[in-house]
Amino acid sequence: MNPLFTIGHSTHVFPRFLALLQQHGIEIVTDVRSRPFSRLPWFSRPSLEKELKDNGIRYVFLGLELGARRDERECYIGERADYDRIAQLPLFQKGLERLNVGIAKARIALMCAEKDPLDCHRTILVCRYAKEFSDVFHIHADGKLESHEKAEARLLARYHEDAYDLFRSRIEQLNEAYKRRGEEIAYVEQPETSSAVRDAPWNDEF
């Protein structure tokens, strides 16, 4: 079984982004952005898909299944998306199942925009559950890998200076840290903003 990787495109130029993927032998980039577009045109879906294909890397869009900006109203508390609710969606569960199937066949990197894994739903939402069926590693901008366990340690330290709480287990503290970070980074709908542009689910499999 291959590990699962994640990467944030950040403000990289495409050659640097490609070099990071090649450094870690990535065969498939799985885009988990709800809106697969960027102010950096080489990271918008049409250009990105073509450039990756030209360099022997496949592009798969799973923003509908695993994205953090949802159309389903039941995923919101007020105007804020709730990660716990998103995780219960059948469509989200389907996305996780596709990842599980995919990593048996290829080296996959989940891609979103944010540089730091802890600033992105790819870590705080998707990998919180993907870690149950795969080892997870986050590709940083300098090319170094961070295990998901180390990312969780950073997350825990952000909210719990004393990791040796006598009254709560590490799991309880970690679950609270996930929830708090999710609330901080979750998508908040704006009244004047229309629904996110969506792609139909892809019928192809990994």
Where in this protein do the model-derived segments appear?
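Residues lining hydrophobic/aromatic ligand-binding pockets adjacent to catalytic sites
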Residues: M1-F206
